[in-house]
Amino acid sequence: MNNDDIAGRLQAVIARHLAPPGTPHNLRQLTGGANRSTWSFDAEAGGAIHHLIMQHGGATEDLATGLVPQLEPEQDARLMIAASEIGVPAPKVRAILEPADGLGHGYVTTHVAGETLGQRIVRDEKFAGARAVMATQCGEILAATHRIDLPRVPFLMRLRPGVPARRFQVLSCDQVLSCADDNPQPD
């Protein structure tokens, strides 16, 4: 699917979820994401420009293996909605994609300005002030997530903490050992 196809399909999403309906502009794919695609775009609606993000995709095959504790994109969106309703900072979910949209599983949120690359946050002096308060803020936000009403997000109950991660670690170690066996190191 090319950018024009995606923009055309986003037009229908915007028409359903922005009042008044708008037109997508400046569509560009962002870097990052191992199994999901993230796009930035602007939507002009009612004389205002809305800066938005669409994230879609996700490998349901990974969920079936139980190796990686991962949520479906729709579940991510529903978790962001539940979190923001109790005051946890989260992007505002503007739309959850539907099959008729032809964009796969995903959602559209407001764009949140900021830096996402950990290396820049750790090394760039302009983030020194943020680094001074970040651990405290992250702890407060993480603690606040415990106030989410679990019946609102029942899909979280299927994740058993640690079990999928341990399986993944064992698989990773086995793969590393297998590679080491195939590539003997010099004495």
What is each stretch, according to the model?
Residues 28-170, 178-184:
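ATP-binding pocket architecture of kinase catalytic cores
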Residues 22, 184-185:
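Residue-level signal for secondary-structure boundary elements
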